[in-house]
Every structure is written in structure tokens, then in C-alpha cells.
């Protein structure tokens, strides 16, 4: 077994060999290297054909019309384009937007920017399980609400929001719904012919495709209009200018094709791995699962080990690639804002580790990881005076520490 072991599939995934093969065919002089916008020769036509084939493959996974798929540089750009694009286009109808406190930073920071431009944003608090309900959204609606943005599968805790029910509500009120689905492709069924979703963001690198490419679903029926945030040659029907990266687009298409083919079997396998891992660590004292046990993807186990500092646990697990918080924010020493929104105290938020399993995770790796986690937690607790106090029956939350 090779070390270190990668258990951070929610941060990024390796490119599937089938995807890499297809991408490599679009780079060299003997390959399909043309500019898809070159209309005057066969190199351009071939590249355009490959791009449109990939567009169909992405649309097929989510049961959309290929004409509703707009290429972007990733889910961050898709979130920006969807939220800013819709807010600016429909600003004359209203200036109120609704989102949740547990969105990805790409949504939260986009909302913050719109607040600086004069929009008003309501940030909803989830349940302690990490779920946002239609009732919460309904209670926050106003006459001037134009857009609701809700994450589908949470990147930190893996919980799944009921997008179908939320879509019924927003559509009945004539309000646009944007969904960040970066973490859900290949994990959860998405049927955009049934879901009442207006805008949906996708990423390739969370689904065994390359980094630097994503897509935005923009509904045609009912027709949704967005203002471009990137200006230039008018590519992608004017919504997103810039020469299309054929090799990355082809990679995303193939990744989504494979996801559609393998999803059912892969979910069963990963659920078995996740359960196997949890069974081996669940007897640790003061262990907490963050997020709903039922409405979550099996790929994600976010655990808090009380009386152990998450950062020191990560250092102790030097042969495991895991994370505390999300990859985008875990460089800061602030406790995870997602866990704080769930009502976790600072200590539990700081002691959290996200284990995420994927296509290339094996039983052997999971067993090794579980063993190392148990050893490290027990070892660190032996060193912890707080653990001693807890074992002696002291209620640590009642202690007033002297300030230096």
C-alpha cells in the first residue's frame, strides 16, 4: 500500500485515466488542437464538434438541454456569473437576495460584493443537522426578493438539501433559484427536466475531471437571462467570452459521461467504505458526526474529536491526506464557519476533521486510516490536561480561565 493515503476527495479528485486519454487527443499538432470558434477550416470544425459533444455529455448527466450548458473556468466562476449576472439583469424588479450561512465561499463572497453594490442579502441559519428547509426560505421571502441561492451537497459536511422542494417554492413565487452543485455531480441524481431550478453550477475537478473548467446551467424554459461578467468575443451566446479550452472541455464531458455510467455502483461501494471506516472509529469517546446522518452523501464523514485540536490531529496523521474545514479556507486558524452555523462550539469546530472517500479509495486504505486515527486521538488525549479534567468529571464549560 502506497503512503500517504488520499482521503480528501471533496477538495479535488485525480483525473480518471479515461478522461486523461481523451484530453491528450486535443493538444498536439496531430490532434484536435484547433480553435472551436474558427469557422473557416476543418481544424475549427473538428474542435467545435468535440466541444458540442462534451456539452451533450454534461447535459446528459443532469438531464438538461445541451443549449442550457455554458462553459466557465470552474464552479467559482459559475457561481459568480449566475448570482451577479441574474442580480444585475433583474435589479429593476428588486434588490433582495437570499442564501444560507453554509454556502461555499464563492457564493458568500459574491453575495457580500452585491451588498456593497446596494443589494440586500438574507443569510439563513441551517438546522443543527446542516439542512436548509423550504419553510426557512419562505419565511425570508419579501416582495422585492429576486434570487435564492442554495448549495446542493455541502462541501464541508456532505449534507444534501431538498432542492426539489425548494424549487417548487421559488418557482411558485416567481423567484429565481440558483444551486451550487459542484459537490453533487456523480454522487446524487440530478434531473433538471423535473427540478424547478433556474441556474446550476458545476465543476469538473470534483468529478474526476481536470481543474480549471466548469459549467453553468441556464434554464431555457422558463427562459432565464443573465448579464455577462466577462466581455470579449461573445462566445457562449454572449454569456461568457473567451476562447474555449477544447482539451479541458472534452475532459469534463468524458468525466461526466463516466459519472453517469458508474454512479450507482460507485455510491454503493463508497457507502460500504465509509461505513467500514466509521465502525472502526465510532467507539472513541466524545466523537461527534457533523451534519445529518441520513441526508448526506456517503463520500463525506466530517467528525469532531472532542479535546483534540484538529490541527494537531492532522499533523499526527502524517500519512493521511485529510482536511479541517474546506480546502479554500483551512489555511486560516478560524474555526469552520459551517460548523459554527450548525451551532457547534469553538472547541468542537476546532477538533473537526473531514474524511472524504472516492473512486480510488480501497478497503486496505480505510482500515489503515481508521487504525491511525484511533491511535492518534488516544495519544493526543493522554497529553491533554483538558481530557484529564473531563475524565475526572469536571465541567470544562463552567471554568473561568484567568486572562494573561
Curated annotation (Swiss-Prot):
Primary location class: cytoplasm
Pfam family, one: Aminotran_5
GO CC term, one of those recorded: L-cysteine desulfurase complex
EC number: 2.8.1.7
Annotated active site: 328
Enzyme class: transferase
Provenance organism: Pseudomonas fluorescens (strain SBW25)
Family as reported in the entry's similarity comment: Belongs to the class-V pyridoxal-phosphate-dependent aminotransferase family. NifS/IscS subfamily.
Binding-site positions, [2Fe-2S] cluster: 328
Catalytic reaction list: (sulfur carrier)-H + L-cysteine = (sulfur carrier)-SH + L-alanine
Keyword field: 2Fe-2S, Cytoplasm, Iron, Iron-sulfur, Metal-binding, Pyridoxal phosphate, Transferase
Protein name, UniProt field: Cysteine desulfurase IscS
Modified residues (N6-(pyridoxal phosphate)lysine): 206
Reported function: Master enzyme that delivers sulfur to a number of partners involved in Fe-S cluster assembly, tRNA modification or cofactor biosynthesis. Catalyzes the removal of elemental sulfur atoms from cysteine to produce alanine. Functions as a sulfur delivery protein for Fe-S cluster synthesis onto IscU, an Fe-S scaffold assembly protein, as well as other S acceptor proteins.
Cofactor(s) this protein cannot do without: pyridoxal 5'-phosphate
Pathway: Cofactor biosynthesis; iron-sulfur cluster biosynthesis
Gene Ontology biological process terms in this record: [2Fe-2S] cluster assembly
Statement: the UniProt record of this protein carries the keyword Cytoplasm: yes
Molecular function terms, GO-annotated: 2 iron, 2 sulfur cluster binding; cysteine desulfurase activity; metal ion binding; pyridoxal phosphate binding
Quaternary structure and interacting proteins, as annotated: Homodimer. Forms a heterotetramer with IscU, interacts with other sulfur acceptors.
Binding residue positions for pyridoxal 5'-phosphate: 75-76, 155, 183, 203-205, 243
Subcellular location: Cytoplasm
Tagged with keyword S-adenosyl-L-methionine: no
Amino acid at each position: 500500500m502506497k503512503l500517504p493515503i488520499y482521503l480528501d476527495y471533496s477538495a479535488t479528485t485525480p483525473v480518471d485515466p479515461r478522461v486523461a486519454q481523451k484530453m491528450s487527443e486535443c493538444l498536439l499538432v496531430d490532434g484536435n488542437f484547433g480553435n472551436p470558434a474558427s469557422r473557416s477550416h476543418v481544424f475549427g470544425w473538428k474542435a467545435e464538434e468535440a466541444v458540442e459533444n462534451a456539452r451533450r455529455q454534461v447535459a446528459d448527466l443532469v438531464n438538461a438541454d445541451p443549449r442550457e450548458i455554458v462553459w466557465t473556468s470552474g464552479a467559482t466562476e459559475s457561481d459568480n456569473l449566475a448570482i451577479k449576472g441574474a442580480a444585475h439583469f433583474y435589479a429593476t424588479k428588486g434588490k433582495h437576495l437570499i442564501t444560507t450561512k453554509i454556502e461555499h465561499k464563492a457564493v458568500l463572497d459574491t453575495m457580500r460584493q452585491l451588498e456593497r453594490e446596494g443589494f440586500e442579502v438574507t443569510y439563513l441559519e441551517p438546522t443543527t443537522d446542516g439542512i436548509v428547509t423550504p419553510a426557512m426560505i419562505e419565511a425570508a421571502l419579501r416582495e422585492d426578493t429576486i434570487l435564492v441561492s442554495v448549495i446542493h451537497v455541502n462541501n464541508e459536511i456532505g449534507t444534501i438539501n431538498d432542492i426539489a422542494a425548494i424549487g417548487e417554492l421559488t418557482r411558485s413565487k416567481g423567484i429565481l433559484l440558483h444551486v451550487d452543485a459542484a459537490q453533487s455531480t456523480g454522487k446524487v441524481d440530478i434531473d433538471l427536466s423535473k427540478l424547478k431550478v433556474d441556474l446550476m453550477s458545476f465543476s469538473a475537478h470534483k468529478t474526476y475531471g481536470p481543474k480549471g473548467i466548469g459549467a453553468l446551467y441556464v434554464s431555457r424554459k422558463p427562459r432565464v437571462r443573465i448579464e455577462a461578467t466577462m466581455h470579449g468575443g461573445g462566445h457562449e451566446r454572449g454569456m461568457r467570452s473567451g476562447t474555449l479550452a477544447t482539451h479541458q472541455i472534452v475532459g469534463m464531458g468524458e468525466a461526466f459521461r463516466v459519472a453517469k455510467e458508474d454512479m450507482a455502483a460507485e455510491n454503493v461501494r463508497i457507502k460500504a467504505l465509509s461505513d467500514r471506516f466509521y465502525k472502526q472509529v465510532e467507539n472513541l469517546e466524545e466523537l461527534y458526526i457533523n451534519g445529518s446522518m441520513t441526508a448526506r452523501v456517503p463520500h463525506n464523514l466530517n467528525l469532531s474529536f472532542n479535546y483534540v485540536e484538529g490541527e494537531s490531529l492532522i499533523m499526527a496523521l502524517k500519512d493521511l491526506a485529510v482536511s479541517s474545514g474546506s480546502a479554500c479556507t483551512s489555511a486560516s486558524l478560524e474555526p469552520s464557519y459551517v460548523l459554527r452555523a450548525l451551532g457547534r462550539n469553538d472547541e468542537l469546530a476546532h477538533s473537526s476533521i473531514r474524511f472524504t472517500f472516492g473512486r480510488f479509495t480501497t478497503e486496505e486504505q480505510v482500515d489503515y486510516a481508521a487504525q491511525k486515527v484511533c491511535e492518534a486521538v488516544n495519544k493526543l488525549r493522554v497529553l491533554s490536561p483538558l481530557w484529564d479534567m473531563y475524565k475526572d468529571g469536571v465541567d470544562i464549560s463552567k471554568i473561568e480561565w484567568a486572562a494573561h
